[in-house]
Amino acid sequence: MPPAVVRGMCEEILRRKLKVEWWGNVRFDAAFTPALCRLMAKAGCIAVTGGLECANDRLLKLMNKGVTLASAEKVLKAFKAAKIFVHAYLMYDFPTETKAEQKEAERYVKGLGRKGLIQSCFWHRFALTVHSPIAKEPEKFGIVIERPRKSARVFARNELAFRIGSQSSQRKC
């Protein structure tokens, strides 16, 4: 839910004097200011879910996510101050991600939890999907898309098998 849409929805809920509880998916965009988060809470928002992805600035930039860890953390603080529950989606095994970056991301996310900035999270293994920007520019991410074949792991029936060097994405979980 883009911040402008959220603002309009909240204003309409309040204008109509509706008594509702709701939650939505967001990007941890800087436009989620403390004032907007307070408005959301006043309009009945109890939770948001959003992607911190790999929780690493290098990878967020490579993914062209438009946020940094510092800017996302500022938004998380605004949600906390408004008493809005935050669930973060994360991923691991993103192309070019190192084991050291994974460990640092884990430490960082645990720190967000200790600070009360996120209340829950879930780590998903990276899946390359047909219509993703990564599938459109695989060389930018150091991957080779393998011939289309039935993937051992299927996500929305559009997952692509790929390899990084000689390592296939068809690993057993």
PLM regions: where:
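Catalytic cores of alpha/beta
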Residues: 35-37, 95-112
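Short, hinge-like loop/turn segments at secondary-structure boundaries
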Residues: 40-41, 66-67, 105-107, 139-140
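Conserved SAM/AdoMet-binding glycine-rich loop
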Residues: 1-85
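Flexible glycine/acidic-rich beta-alpha junction loops that bind and position SAM and/or redox cofactors
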Residues: 4, 58, 62-63, 92-100, ...
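Hydrophobic, Leu/Ile/Phe/Ala-enriched alpha-helical segments that form helix-helix packing faces
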Residues: 13, 109-113, 173
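Hydrophobic, well-ordered secondary-structure elements that form the walls
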Residues: 50, 88, 109, 121
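Structural beta-sheet core signal
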Residues: 24, 88-90, 123
